[in-house]
Curated annotation (Swiss-Prot):
Native species: Sinorhizobium fredii (strain NBRC 101917 / NGR234)
PROSITE patterns: HTH_CROC1
Residues annotated as domain HTH cro/C1-type: 24-78
Keyword hit for DNA-binding: yes
CDD domains reported in the protein's UniProt record: HTH_XRE (cd00093)
SMART domains reported in the protein's UniProt record: HTH_XRE (SM00530)
Protein name: Uncharacterized HTH-type transcriptional regulator y4aM
DNA-binding positions: 35-54
Segment forming the signal sequence: none
Record keyword Transcription regulation present: yes
Amino acid sequence: MLSVDPEKKRAKANAVDIYVGRRIRQRRRWQNMSQAALGEAIGVTFQQVQKYEKGSNRVGAGRLQQISDALEVHPSYFFEDMPDDTQSIGQGAPNQAYIPPEVIEFAASDEGVELIRAFSRVGNLNVRCRIVKLLKSLGEHDW
């Protein structure tokens, strides 16, 4: 009788799982959807959605398609801009600009999404540049 190696019995999440999870979270938040609402749409609990988003549980192909449908994106969205070197996920790939984890976390927060949405509605390039200068200036002060 063949015995199953306990280490191989349950696949552990890896850097790709973490990256896909982050993309799920970003898209869900961009859509103003709660974890509970996404879970209901795909037939899982909000806790399971949390695990997918953290990368602690792998998302199978069928489930990824359900998530894609619920979030109104093509499944390839979750792999876009993924570093070629999956070991560098979270640290920035050599051919990509490094984005610190705290910036990624802020961008995915309610406040970050609100700021990004508001900024993206500013069409005038000069106004955008002034907003960026203002924010940089405010960020230099120790309030």
